[in-house]
């Protein structure tokens, strides 16, 4: 079989970043400095006049919710509808994650056969909540917008339980999913960013720099950060029905079509991009015809 690898090419990616820090350091202020922010406020923390003015000046908007499913509806709308916003800010995700943990435990308790079950046995509620967070992140990776998630901070411990610093207070693998992770700090009157994780050449691991949108834009590329979002067309009902029909006809193994979903960052066929699902349909039709 011929080798299928391609020579690597640089791709202009939207910024996907995680900001965390203690209360009052200015995580929200830092995040809404980015172009045309669509702020999803999960703590009603952006109601003061200062935040309102920043949002107005930057052409932003605010949506307040404490419900994870409402958040998902907004993300899907931003993914698939034409709009003027360029940066999605979820501030903070910690609140929604903790709510997911509580709801997952309650669901497991309700459906348990054990009378004294709490729903938290063996950390199963974490597994349930983490599935939903992974689904969210899959959609965020497809979103043609800058994405900034903020998180509360918590102490980070060494094996001997000595405090060695701070880390984000959320899904513990959240940092794997982002190109940049900043710990936002306040030093006197100045706000600084400590680079806790980077996949980008122009941001050095463990460096500290005065935080501003201008500084980020100079390093990342203003054109990338400020270009208009392009909506993504999802699979039609007809495409979904046709693909399911072909899968059943040919008896495609689940592990095969699950790879198709994973590759497109989709949890179900209805979430697949229109062009991606059409490639699957065309492939199966060729297979039927023996090509």
Give, region by region, the residue ranges found by the protein language model:
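Short, glycine/polar-rich helix-capping loops at beta-to-alpha or helix-loop-helix junctions
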Residues: 27, 45-53, 170
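Short, basic, glycine/proline-bearing loop/turn elements
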Residues: 11-17, 52-64, 117-125
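P-loop NTPase motor core
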Residues: 92-173
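Structural motif
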Residues: 18, 87-89, 148-149
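Conserved catalytic network of the ASCE P-loop NTPase/AAA+ motor domain
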Residues: 10-12, 78-83, 139-143, 173-175
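Conserved nucleotide-sensing/catalytic segment adjacent to the nucleotide-binding pocket
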Residues: 50-114
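Interfaces that engage single-stranded nucleic acids at replication/repair/recombination sites
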Residues: 2-27, 32-34, 38, 44-46, ...
């Amino acid at each position: 079989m011929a080798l299928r690898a391609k020579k690597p090419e640089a791709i202009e990616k939207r910024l996907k970043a995680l900001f965390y820090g203690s209360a009052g350091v200015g995580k929200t202020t830092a995040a809404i400095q980015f172009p045309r922010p669509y702020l999803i406020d999960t703590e009603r923390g952006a109601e003061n006049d200062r935040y309102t003015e920043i949002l107005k000046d930057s052409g932003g908007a605010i949506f307040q919710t404490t419900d994870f499913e409402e958040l998902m509806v907004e993300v899907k709308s931003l993914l698939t509808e034409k709009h003027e916003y360029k940066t999605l800010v979820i501030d903070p995700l910690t609140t929604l994650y903790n709510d997911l943990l509580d709801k997952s435990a309650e669901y497991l308790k309700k459906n348990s056969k054990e009378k004294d079950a709490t729903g938290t046995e063996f950390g199963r509620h974490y597994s349930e909540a983490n599935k939903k967070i992974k689904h969210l992140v899959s959609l965020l990776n497809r979103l043609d917008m800058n994405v900034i998630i903020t998180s509360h901070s918590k102490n980070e411990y060494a094996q001997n339980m000595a405090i060695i610093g701070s880390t984000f207070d959320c899904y513990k693998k959240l940092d794997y999913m982002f190109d940049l992770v900043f710990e936002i700090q306040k030093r006197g009157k100045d706000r600084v960013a400590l680079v806790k994780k980077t996949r980008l050449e122009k941001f050095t691991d463990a460096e500290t720099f005065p935080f501003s949108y201008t500084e980020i834009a100079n390093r990342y590329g203003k054109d990338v950060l400020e270009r208009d979002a392009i909506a993504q067309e999802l699979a039609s009902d007809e495409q979904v029905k046709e693909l399911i029909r072909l899968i059943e006809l040919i008896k495609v193994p689940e592990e095969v079509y699950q790879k198709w979903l994973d590759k497109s960052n989709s949890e179900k066929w209805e979430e697949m991009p229109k062009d991606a699902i059409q490639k699957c349909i065309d492939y199966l039709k060729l297979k039927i015809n023996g090509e």
